[in-house]
């Protein structure tokens, strides 16, 4: 049913979630719209730096930048260069989340962004959340497994097809 995600978003907030990344549910039910940019947002820019600059120009330095589209270490460096040490947060959406969160935390601290938050996403279920308890993670983006339920089949993949004309025409 095409309305299942909207209903699930409302139910999650009723159940204690801070908000939803489902913009239709947020609009329909007056919920707090939260979330970060998608990989396609980064891909439609000439490079990661210009994507980060665009997001910060629109949402301010307190936004959360997605840092795993290309190279996480380079993205974190670029994010702090663009936003400064007051960058609100970074999001990791793939790979070994616990290990990457630790590496990113160390890098952020070394760059002076000691208050920058780390959010992890990627088909998180109760087992993944339990495995992340000792990782330096500030928040979790839970969606797929919340809506479908643990044990139900899902398609854990991202297809990043993007076409655009570059700035040179």
Predicted regions and their residues:
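Buried, small/hydrophobic-residue-enriched core segments of structured protein domains
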Residues: 1-114, 124-131, 135-136, 148, ...
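Short hydrophobic alpha-helical runs that function as membrane-insertion/retention elements
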Residues: 35, 119, 139-142
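Generic secondary-structure boundary/loop-capping signal
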Residues: 38, 94, 143, 158-159
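Active-site lining segments that contact anionic ligands and/or coordinate catalytic metals
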Residues: 115, 137, 156-158
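Glycine-rich phosphate-binding active-site loops on the catalytic face of alpha/beta enzymes
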Residues: 138-155
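C-terminal structural cap/anchor segments
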Residues: 150-169
